[in-house]
Amino acid sequence: STTMNEKLMENFLSLCAIPHKSHHEEKISRFLYDWAVKKGLAAVRDEEGNVIIDKPGSAGHEDAPRTILQAHMDMVVVWEDGMDFDPLNDTITVINDGKTLKAKGTSLGGDDGAGVALAMSILEDESAVHGPIRAIFTVDEEDGMSGADHLDPKHLDAKYLINLDWEEFGSLCNSSAGSDMYRMHRAAEWEAASGKAYKIAVSGLVGGHSGASIHLKLA
């Protein structure tokens, strides 16, 4: 029989075969919706492209608290200089050496393809004993969070939520980092240059990732 690891790999490779750059998740969004329908699972695809999939609890656990598994379907796409690659149409070529996965000349998309594939594998596992499960796959996590921003709060009706986008294998992070983005406009008119120009620089500060280094209280 197919093991969970084999099913996980199969699902991940199926995602790699679909271009899913941020802001261009139409194909993978439809794929996930169709996949759920074929599995006999209740699925919703909202106007933003988010996909919400529900699986009832296993026998005897239908009334247990619901657990949400959340992952994002977009990826950051980069490729080697000089490589002929179209991120909107070309697929990721995965290299598996038996120990690790990497992509040929491009980013792999493990963030967060691994999370999406894991949720898919859990949803189709008929041997597991579980309460109701809801998978929420959002778009545009890497560049704006528009998927999460436009998600109808009614889909968050659950006692537990597990985000499948953590950085360390075999560990859990009981926390969350957030961010705000603003776009400001001001009308301006050009003036003839005059006077002296000065350059002011603020440097030598120590920064860090807003999520991974937030506890260090850096500048």
Where are these regions (language model features)?
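Alpha-helical scaffold segments in soluble metabolic enzymes
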Residues: 11-14, 31-34, 118-121, 150, ...
